[in-house]
């Protein structure tokens, strides 16, 4: 269908979902599968999927300075970013403000996702936890992504999603215990809802998309511990305050930066 002298426009704005196919057209060293070279092919994209001179970008990426990872690096803090394949870009490229290369003092670890998460709803939680616990004394800051809740919720299967969340619950519990033993502080949060709402109330159909439900922000540390009744906790969970933009400054304050 695509011939020489054609123009090819990619209009999806999600880099992590588009860079693979775009690389097949503009990557000089692409060798994942055989392809026919097309002369004078004009390839354009809505946003910057990859850094390649052959890709014409309609809206270049604005430079974002002093993101959390960059500020930690400037303050000589060692940081560890870990996720499985499904969410690796979220703890690297996206977390680092659309920068592909790690900052000084940053280590990235990728745990390869299993082929069928429906048959393995625990996904890579065990490997991620094991790696974090083994590295806990070597770094000042960790950003850890557990993909189960998001990935499994897209299938709309409540039973499978519950198993995935249970795996996360166990994993977070192990990390929490290790962090508190060392006198550290831990934050548990998310950037969107999904697993908590898998059915549309109006129709009863499966709800498999992200939603804008309020997400929790749990601040865990001995200095923040206080007794609260079940009613207090339930009341707090119904309130919505704060923004995702508040998290990075909160972390920097906790770290004395």
Located regions from the model:
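Feature captures the catalytic ectodomains and active-site-proximal regions of enzymes
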Residues: 1-257
């Amino acid at each position: 269908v695509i011939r020489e002298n054609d123009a090819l426009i990619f209009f999806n704005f999600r880099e992590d979902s588009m860079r693979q196919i775009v690389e097949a057209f503009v990557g000089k060293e692409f060798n994942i599968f055989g392809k026919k070279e097309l002369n004078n092919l004009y390839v354009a994209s809505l946003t910057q999927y990859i850094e390649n001179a052959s890709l014409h970008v309609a809206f270049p990426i604005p430079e974002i300075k002093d993101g959390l990872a960059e500020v930690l690096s400037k303050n000589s803090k060692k940081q560890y970013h870990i996720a499985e394949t499904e969410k690796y870009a979220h703890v690297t490229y996206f977390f680092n403000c659309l920068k592909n290369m790690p900052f000084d003092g940053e280590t990235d670890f990728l745990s390869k996702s299993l082929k069928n998460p429906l048959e393995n709803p625990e996904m890579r939680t065990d490997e991620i936890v094991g790696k974090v616990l083994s590295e806990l004394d070597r770094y000042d800051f960790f950003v850890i992504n557990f993909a189960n809740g998001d990935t499994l919720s897209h299938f709309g299967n409540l039973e499978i999603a519950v198993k995935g969340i249970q795996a996360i619950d166990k994993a977070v519990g192990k990390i929490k215990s290790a962090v508190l033993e060392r006198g550290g502080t831990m934050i548990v949060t998310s950037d969107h809802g999904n697993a908590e709402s898998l059915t549309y109330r109006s129709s009863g159909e499966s709800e498999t998309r992200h939603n804008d439900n309020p997400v929790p922000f749990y601040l865990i540390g001995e200095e923040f511990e206080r007794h609260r009744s079940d009613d207090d906790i339930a009341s707090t969970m119904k309130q919505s305050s704060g923004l995702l933009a508040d998290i990075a400054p909160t972390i920097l304050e906790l770290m004395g930066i």
